[in-house]
Each structure stands twice: as C-alpha cells, then as structure tokens.
C-alpha cells in the first residue's frame, strides 16, 4: 500500500514538472525577442506588403496644356548578368531608369555601373549586405550606404545621394536611423508600385514577364509612379518591353531620378529625406 502511494506521488510530481516545462516553452515561444524579430523579418521580406505611399510632390508640370505623367522605373540588387540586356532595351526605347546597386555587384561589374551612368540613368545605393539585422537592428544603414557610395564614386566620378532601403524603409528605418540618414546627407526612395517580379522565379520566363507587366500596368494610375523591379531576374528584364509599351500607351514618360528635383517617396512620409 505504502509503495503504491509513493508511486502515485512520483507520478504527480512528474506531471507537475512536465506542465511547468510546457508552460514555460509556450511562454517563450510567444514572448521571446528572438522569435518576435524573426517573425518581423519574415514580414518585411515581402516588399508587396509595404504600405502605399503618397508622394509629396507638387503638381506635375504641364506640356501643351496637358498634365505630364512620369514613370520612374527603378531596379534593385544589380548590376548582374541581365543588366546589359536591360540597358539595351532602355536605349532602344529612349527610356531612362534608376538603379540601386549592391556593393558586391558594383565590385564585380564596374563596366556596367559605368555604362548605367554614361547612358543617362541614375545610379544609387542599395547597401553592401542587404541584411535586415545588420542594416536596421545593428544600425549600419548609413555606414553601408557610405561604403557603397564610395565604390560607385570611384567608378563614375561622383557621389550619389539617393538610397533604396532593402525590404523597404518600414519598419526597419526607425526615427533614429532616419535622423542619421538626414545628417549624412542621404535621401531615401521606396516605391509606389511593386512589380512583384521576384515572385515568379519558378515560372517560365515568358509567362512570368507577362504577369509582371500586368502587375505594373494595372496599378499605374497616378501622374507619377515609382516602380520597383530587380535586374537580377531574367523575367524582370523580359517584362520591360511590354511595360514600356503599355505605360507609353497610358501617356507616361520615363525619367531617371534627379537630385536637383528630389521629392520624398518613403513609407514614413518623412519629408526630410
């Protein structure tokens, strides 16, 4: 009888320990900062989920009594092996674009950086690492942009000011980092249209290009649009001819970013940058 009682007591203790352990694990899974950050990082990877941004730009200039419509094609993450083809297409259509470059690719493809600038496109910075934790949690955004800027300046002979935040400026580019951006003399551009070009890597290029073009053309409704694309994907470059044609039919012209006529395009609506 006494032996049976001891066994019951041991079982009760073991159950209690297990319950405490399970409760602690569940609490950690909910409140752990590491898990919260990981969840946050997974969210910001999806550029398409960033908020819509209204551009704080004055009324566009008019030509022959008509309001001008301007599309700013922007390409992130390059240069890469498809960039030369993209530049050929832009040249054929007499269209200018804006490129946001990764430091490692600047080093690998200096001739493409030089060509982008020589053909009238704007060359800006997209960081060295494209790493959320380093750029935002560790506060290295401005330092990485300065390093990237230096690499570009060594090739094109001038230091660009415009940056494109990897994953978009929200939520990573907090007020403290934005203050540093302003102090460093940099500007920030997010986008008004996400082409979602990165989403179609596993589709046939032609089908993917058609979908990307549709994404852009469907959403191009305002006098100025800043369009997010990436020149490291074949489907992105393949989509450009249809995008150019479709936007022209909707009355758009194509311009590169100009520092002297900067206007804010950021998810924070921070007019300083």
Curated annotation (Swiss-Prot):
Location(s) in or outside the cell: Cell membrane
Molecular function in Gene Ontology: hydrolase activity, acting on carbon-nitrogen (but not peptide) bonds; metal ion binding
Pfam families linked: Polysacc_deac_1
Documented EC number(s): 3.5.1.104
EC top class, as a word: hydrolase
Chain segments annotated as transmembrane: 10-30
Regulation: Inhibited by the hydroxamate N-hydroxy-4-(naphthalene-1-yl)benzamide (NHNB).
GO cellular component: a single term: plasma membrane
Binding annotation for Zn(2+): 77, 126, 130
Swiss-Prot/TrEMBL cofactor(s): Zn(2+); Co(2+); Ni(2+)
Active site: 76 (proton acceptor), 230 (proton donor)
Gene Ontology biological process terms, A to Z: carbohydrate metabolic process
Keyword Metal-binding in annotation: yes
Catalytic activity: peptidoglycan-N-acetyl-D-glucosamine + H2O = peptidoglycan-D-glucosamine + acetate
Keywords, alphabetical: Cell membrane, Cobalt, Hydrolase, Membrane, Metal-binding, Nickel, Transmembrane, Transmembrane helix, Zinc
NCBIfam families given in the database record: PgAcgDacpgdA2_Bac
Family under the similarity heading: Belongs to the polysaccharide deacetylase family.
Role description: Catalyzes the deacetylation of N-acetylglucosamine (GlcNAc) residues in peptidoglycan.
Name recorded for this polypeptide: Peptidoglycan-N-acetylglucosamine deacetylase BC_1974
Highest classification ranks of the organism: Bacteria, Bacillati, Bacillota, Bacilli, Bacillales
């Amino acid at each position: 009888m006494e032996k049976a009682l001891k066994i019951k007591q041991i079982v009760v203790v073991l159950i209690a320990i297990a319950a405490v352990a399970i409760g602690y694990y569940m609490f950690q899974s909910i409140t752990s900062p590491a898990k919260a950050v990981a969840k946050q990082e997974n969210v910001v990877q999806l550029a398409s989920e960033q908020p819509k941004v209204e551009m704080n730009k004055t009324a566009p200039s008019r030509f022959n009594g008509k309001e001008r419509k301007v599309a700013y094609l922007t390409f992130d993450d390059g240069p890469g092996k498809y960039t030369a083809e993209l530049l050929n297409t832009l040249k054929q259509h007499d269209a200018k674009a804006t490129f946001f470059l990764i430091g490692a690719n600047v080093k690998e493809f200096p001739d493409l950086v030089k060509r982008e600038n020589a053909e009238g496109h704007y060359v800006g910075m997209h960081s060295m690492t494209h790493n959320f934790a380093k750029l935002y949690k560790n506060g290295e955004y401005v330092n990485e942009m300065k390093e990237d800027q230096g690499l570009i300046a060594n090739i094109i002979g001038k230091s660009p000011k415009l940056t494109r935040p990897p994953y978009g400026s929200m939520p990573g580019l907090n007020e403290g980092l934005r203050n540093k951006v302003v102090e460093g003399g940099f500007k920030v551009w997010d986008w008004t249209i996400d082409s979602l070009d990165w989403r179609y890597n596993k589709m046939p290029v032609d089908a993917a290009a058609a979908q990307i073009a549709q994404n852009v053309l469907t959403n191009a409704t305002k006098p100025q649009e800043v369009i997010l694309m990436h020149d490291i994907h074949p489907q992105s470059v393949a989509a450009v001819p249809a995008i150019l044609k479709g936007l022209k039919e909707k009355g758009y012209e194509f311009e590169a970013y100009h520092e002297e006529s900067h206007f804010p395009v950021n998810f924070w609506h921070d007019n300083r940058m």
